[in-house]
Regions:
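FIC/Doc superfamily catalytic core
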Residues: 1-348
């Protein structure tokens, strides 16, 4: 059986791309928290739109679709009219629970099984959150129409113990101060997908669990910009990363990094989209100067002017350059390098 071990996340030799993504996401998290305090009405509007998009997108990834009008109605509480809509409504119910009560839940078997039962109850009233009783496979359809086995998850016999071990490994890593929790989340989600503990609904549940773990660690952008929508928008990259990282999993040689990079890239895109939508509401009291200052001062790694422009796409390079100059002259940040190679970091 697979051995779950996240101690590698304490390694100082983690890929620079992962460390940079995690650092920039953390800086953007601080910015969004500031905005939320100052603009509650604007964030409520974003939350309503994101909920509809999340319900639509997460189900669409699995081929569960209906009209936009019906998705909006179901998101608003309407009863489902058929089996497809029952599956969509089940996702709606768990998503609402995660949004409202995430602090009361965690990555533990009781919650995972309860979420699955709630997600499936309208489409299959007999579902009680039990793990699969038959082995399942992840198949891929080839261009000539043939199906080939892409991945063999944990067997039905292995699943109960695999889930116990996965939950214990997560709890151990969660309580380890040396492990970056933002890096831990995609590793746990990858392992959940590789166990594939239920007969149906594993993909949709994995996205709900992703939100739960992100919210519990303070990364709540998924409430305001649909994380599921971002996954659906780059579905090919998601499946490619999942395929690459799951190879070797049964032999205890998983390659976590491709899935981690894809997961954090998706999350980073949500924070960038939040920045653009926030700017479009024209409701923010935060000045462009204060946003630039907050971005630099809350980053754990040096940022270039281009990095800051990527984080704040509505702010011109000229404005970024002017504010950085002021911060350097004021002694708040120091400049590393020169010219286009310049990076800026908070003075400690």
């Amino acid at each position: 059986m697979h051995i779950f071990d996240y101690s590698f996340l304490k390694n100082d030799l983690l890929p620079a791309q992962l460390v940079s993504l995690a650092s920039n996401i953390s800086a953007l998290k601080v910015m969004s928290a500031f905005r939320k305090r100052e603009n509650e009405t604007a964030f409520r509007k974003l939350e309503d739109a994101a909920k509809i998009e999340s319900i639509k997108a997460s189900n669409a990834i699995e081929g569960i679709v209906t009209t936009d009008q019906r998705v909006r109605a179901i998101a608003g509480g309407s009863a489902p009219l058929n089996h497809t809509e029952a599956e969509i409504a089940g996702y709606r119910d768990v998503l609402s629970e995660v949004h409202v009560n995430f602090a009361a839940h965690d990555f533990r078997e009781s919650d995972i099984r309860a979420f699955h039962a709630q997600m499936m109850r309208l489409a299959n009233p007999l579902t009680d959150g039990s793990y699969k009783t038959d082995d399942n496979v992840i198949a891929e359809r080839m261009p000539d129409g043939r199906r080939v086995v892409r991945f063999q998850p944990a067997s039905a016999a292995e699943t109960p113990e695999a889930m116990r071990q996965l939950v214990l490994a997560y709890a151990e890593a969660r309580d380890d101060a040396a492990i970056n929790k933002l890096l831990l989340v995609p590793c746990v989600i990858l392992d959940f997908l590789c166990v594939h503990p239920f007969a149906d609904g594993n993909g949709r549940l994995s996205r709900l669990l992703s939100l739960l773990l992100l919210y519990r660690n303070g990364f709540d952008v998924g409430k305001y910009i649909s994380f599921e929508g971002a996954v659906n928008g780059r579905k090919a990259e998601y499946y490619a990363a999942l395929k690459e990282s799951s190879e070797g999993w049964r032999d205890n040689q998983p390659r976590y990094f491709p899935f981690m990079v894809d997961f954090l890239t998706t999350l980073y895109s949500c924070y960038n989209e939040l920045d653009k939508r926030f700017a479009s509401t024209n409701a923010g009291k935060a000045t462009k100067k204060s946003r630039i200052e907050s971005t630099v001062l809350n980053s754990f790694t040096p940022l270039s002017k281009a990095d800051i422009c990527g984080i704040l796409p509505d702010v011109s390079p000229t404005t970024v350059e002017a504010v950085l100059g002021e911060m350097v002259r004021g002694g708040r940040v120091r400049r590393i390098g020169a010219g286009r190679a310049s990076r800026y970091v908070r003075r400690t």
